[in-house]
Amino acid sequence: GNEIPECGNKLDVQMGKKIADKIRSLDDTRYVTNSVNFVLSIQDRMGEIMAGMAAENTQEVQKKEEASGAEQQEINSMMTDFAAFMDRIVAGETAGKATEEAFGQVDIAGYNYAACRYESDREKYPDRIIVGSETTPQSLDMNWPLVEKYSNVIGDFSWTAWDYLGEAGIGKITYGEKKGMEFYAPYPYKAA
């Protein structure tokens, strides 16, 4: 799977195991992967996590949003603005615990925007094979040395944010008053 937010949920982790087992029963020659956005896997605890973060960082982002006058941002702007926050959230113990069981069911753990975990997870999960399944283009020069350094990290793939088939909602264009981030649009915006 890719960015399945429920991978941090006990019931859905059980379903993930059933799916992985079924895939292996059909073809045991291929690797089973799950590419996880750690932030999505703990989104139900985000308020609690954000409350624990340093107040000045939260205020800095709020000031930036107020200065731009934007109520909601485009996905690419949001990803850039929150890069520092995301690393802190992703590197946290809550994110690690939430994904531990889901990654234990697959052959290769896909880390979306989580290069900050490569070193610590190599120590904590020495048998885990990791791939940078989605990373930002501006991070490639920092991520590739990590791929070369850690033998359990087998590669790095950059998400280019270019329109392609497969990302639900990104083909939607809005006009008038409803401008802004409406990334998760309902049907018929299921494919770009």
Predicted regions mapped to residue ranges:
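Extended substrate-binding grooves/exosites of carbohydrate-active enzymes
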Residues: 1-192
